[in-house]
Amino acid sequence: MTKLFDSRLADVIRKPVITEKATNALDLNQYTFEVDHRAAKPEIKAAIEALFSVKVIGVNTMNPPRRTRRVGKFSGKRSQVKKAIVRLAEGDKIQLFPES
């Protein structure tokens, strides 16, 4: 991979999504991340494999609708988010929570 491509991979993944549904999916070896809305599935797969040194089996993405936000009489929209559910190979793990 080129150096420019490697620096782009770090910008693809924004943050992990920590919800009840996403936490329950950890038992199925599926991890949920908020990603750049322009990222494609191969980019997301390459970014996860490069950043966490794991083998990705599949990537599912979703673009939920933008939510409207009002401040007084002014109406606007929240920024576009894209979620990716990444399924890892058997035996691979990503450490999201610190060990106690």
Curated annotation (Swiss-Prot):
GO terms for cellular component: ribonucleoprotein complex; ribosome. This is Large ribosomal subunit protein uL23. GO terms for biological process: translation. Keywords: Ribonucleoprotein, Ribosomal protein, RNA-binding, rRNA-binding. Transmembrane segments: none annotated. The gene is rplW. The keyword rRNA-binding applies. Part of the 50S ribosomal subunit. Contacts protein L29, and trigger factor when it is bound to the ribosome. It comes from Prochlorococcus marinus (strain MIT 9215).
